Amino acid sequence: MNTDFIGVIDDALPSNICKEIIKYIDGKQLVQGGYGNGEIDLKYKDVQEVRPVPFLDDGSIVSDHLTKSLMVYTSSYRNSHPAIDEISSWAPLNYYTLKKYDPGQGYHAVHCENSGMSNNINRMLVWLFYFNTVTDAGGTFFPEYDRIVDAVEGRLVIWPAYWTHVHKGIVSETQTKYIASGWYGFINE
């Protein structure tokens, strides 16, 4: 059993789908990504984004493939950590963010995905897809576990959204990185 609760699933998306999603991102109007309350500070986070993208209303190749993959691999994460279903009902939230990091760009600051702000308080898990392999850094660093998850095409990573899993991007100075990230949240019943 994985004791750091960071689930890494390789080949969660096939290469041809990853390439289609990269084309999709490159064909969209990208905006400078902010953090938390939408504030922009390039020392903290420097990224170009398509956001927020609603799962149900998008109707794109992206939503279709991400949804199918998440349905399959959420079960795998649940099976690895069965106690997760003992607390409350949860499911993927209905939006996600597509991101493009040009060389030198990145999420520089250590952060977590549930910081107590009203717009993210119900996040319980994070999911992240890498759409391309970055051989010059480009992964995600979890300092609490001294663990780096490399950016590998088709890889899905799932981890808790809380302070126990603060993380930051590892900036590539030479290569572009494409990802999608979103969250699983508690369902108010």
What are these regions, as identified by a protein language model?
Residues 1-156, 164-189:
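Fe(II)/2-oxoglutarate oxygenase catalytic core
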